[in-house]
C-alpha cells in the first residue's frame, strides 16, 4: 500500500509518499524554475561501520562511479554532462547522498542515473585497488592540511572509542583491506528500502516523480534491516597538543552538545550565530578585530540524530595559543553568565532566518534540506515552522544553553602547533 501526504500552502508544494517496500519519496514543486535537483539519500554513513570497516561507506561512494550493470564508469558522468547537468556524491557520519542537477525536461534521466548508482553498482575488481590508491592520497591530503586534520582529532576527543569519532575517510590500513565482498555486504545490509529517501526539488510534479521511482526501482526488494546504532558513550574533556612542520598554530575548543532530537537545537543555532556567525559575531569582533590575533575564527554546531557537539576554531600564531584560548573561553563565559540584549538576539534571529531563506533560492539546497529532514525526523518542516521556532527562542534560553555547554570543566581543547614552537 502506498501512503501519500502533502503540505500545500501555495508554492512550493511539498508532498511525501512511502512506497510499499518502505522507500520514501519527497518532493517540492516550484513551477517558476526550469531546473531540478535530485538526490538519493541512504541513511548509512561512517557511523554505521565496525572498526574494521572504517571508511567503507565513503569508499563505496567512490566505487559506485566505476560502473553499474547498465553503464561503464565513463558513461555515468557523461550521461548527465551531455545535457548540461551535474552529478556528484558525498558521505557523512550518518548518511550518504548521490545527487544530480539538470533541466526539468531531464527528470527521468537524472533519477535513472542516481538510482542506478545507488542500487546497482558492480564494484569491478580491477578498479578497487586503483580507487584505494586514490582514497589513500585523499587521506594524505587531509593529513597535510592542519585546518582539516584538527577536526579529526577533535571528533576523536569528543566521541572517544565510538564510530562518530572515526574519520569518514577511514585509515590507510582499513582502506587497503577492503574487498569486493566487503563492499557488497555493506550495500546489501545498509542500502535497503527502509533507509532510502528520494528527494526532488524544482519544476516537478510529485505523482510523476513517484511513478518514475516505482518504475526505476522495480525489483528492488532487499529485505528491510533495522537501523541499529551504538549509542554515544561517556565524554571526558581532554587537552591534546601535537606538532607538525607548519607555520601557524590551529586550536579548537569544544564540548559535547545535543542531537537533533533535542528541542534546544534551534537555541543552539542562535547561540552559534551570536558567537561565530560572520564578521559581526562576538568572536570576530572581540578577537580578530580587537586584537588582530587571527585571520580565521568561527564557531560551529554539529547536530546528529542523537548526539552533537559545539566548538570554536581559531588559527593563530604559535606564541599566542594560550592567550587565544583564554580569549575564546572568555567569550564563552560571557554568554554563559550574561543575558544577551534583545537587540543582539533579534539581530541573530534575523541573520539566521535570512540565511535560511536565501539558501532556499537554490534547488539543490531545497533538495538537501528535504533529504536530511526526512532521514532525521520522518516529517516535513515548512519555512513558517522553522521561523516560528527561531522567533520563539528567548534570551534566557540562550544563556541557559550556553551555561550548560560552556562549563569550564566540560571544555576540551585540541591544538596543532609548529614543530619549532
Functional labels for PLM-detected ranges:
Residues 22, 29-82, 154, 191, ...:
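Active/ligand-binding-proximal structured segments within catalytic/core domains
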Amino acid at each position: 500500500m502506498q501512503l501519500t501526504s502533502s503540505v500545500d500552502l501555495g508554492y512550493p508544494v511539498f508532498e511525501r509518499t512511502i512506497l510499499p517496500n518502505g522507500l520514501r519519496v519527497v518532493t517540492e514543486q516550484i513551477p517558476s524554475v526550469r531546473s531540478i535537483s535530485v538526490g538519493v539519500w541512504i541513511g548509512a554513513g561512517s557511523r554505521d561501520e565496525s572498526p574494521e570497516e572504517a571508511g567503507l561507506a565513503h569508499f563505496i561512494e567512490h566505487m559506485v562511479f566505476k560502473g553499474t550493470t547498465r553503464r561503464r564508469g565513463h558513461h555515468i558522468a557523461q550521461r548527465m554532462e551531455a545535457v548540461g547537468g551535474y552529478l556528484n556524491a558525498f558521505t557523512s557520519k550518518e548518511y550518504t547522498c548521490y545527487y544530480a542537477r539538470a533541466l526539468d525536461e531531464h527528470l527521468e534521466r537524472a533519477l535513472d542515473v542516481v538510482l542506478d548508482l545507488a542500487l546497482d553498482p558492480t564494484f569491478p575488481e580491477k578498479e578497487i585497488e586503483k580507487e584505494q590508491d586514490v582514497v589513500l592520497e585523499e587521506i594524505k591530503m587531509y593529513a597535510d592540511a592542519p585546518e582539516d586534520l584538527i577536526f579529526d582529532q577533535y571528533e576523536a576527543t569528543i566521541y572517544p572509542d565510538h564510530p562518530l569519532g572515526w574519520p569518514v575517510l577511514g585509515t590507510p590500513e582499513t582502506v587497503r583491506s577492503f574487498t569486493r565482498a566487503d563492499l557488497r555486504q555493506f550495500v546489501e545490509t545498509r542500502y535497503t528500502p527502509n533507509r532510502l529517501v528520494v528527494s526532488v526539488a524544482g519544476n516537478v510534479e510529485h505523482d510523476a516523480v513517484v511513478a518514475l521511482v516505482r518504475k526505476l526501482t522495480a525489483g528492488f526488494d532487499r529485505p528491510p534491516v533495522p537501523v541499529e546504532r551504538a549509542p554515544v558513550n561517556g565524554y571526558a574533556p581532554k587537552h591534546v597538543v601535537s606538532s607538525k612542520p607548519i607555520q601557524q598554530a590551529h586550536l579548537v575548543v569544544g564540548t559535547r552538545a545535543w542531537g537533533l532530537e533535542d528541542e534546544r537545537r534551534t537555541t543552539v543555532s542562535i547561540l552559534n550565530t551570536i558567537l561565530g556567525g560572520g564578521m559581526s559575531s562576538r568572536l570576530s569582533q572581540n578577537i580578530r578585530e580587537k586584537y588582530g590575533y587571527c585571520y580565521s575564527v568561527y564557531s560551529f554546531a554539529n547536530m546528529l540524530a542523537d548526539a552533537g557537539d559545539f566548538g570554536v576554531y581559531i588559527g593563530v600564531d604559535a606564541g599566542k595559543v594560550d592567550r587565544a584560548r583564554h580569549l575564546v573561553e572568555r567569550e564563552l563565559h560571557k554568554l554563559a553568565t550574561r543575558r544577551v540584549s534583545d537587540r543582539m538576539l533579534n539581530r541573530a534571529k534575523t541573520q539566521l532566518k535570512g540565511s535560511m531563506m536565501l539558501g532556499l533560492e537554490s534547488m539543490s539546497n531545497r533538495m538537501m534540506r528535504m533529504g536530511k529532514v526526512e532521514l532525521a525526523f520522518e516529517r516535513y518542516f515548512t519555512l513558517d515552522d522553522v521561523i516560528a521556532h527561531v522567533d520563539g527562542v528567548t534570551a534566557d534560553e540562550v544563556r541557559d544553553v550556553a551555561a550548560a555547554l560552556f562549563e569550564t570543566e566540560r571544555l576540551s581543547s585540541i591544538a596543532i602547533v609548529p614543530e619549532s614552537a
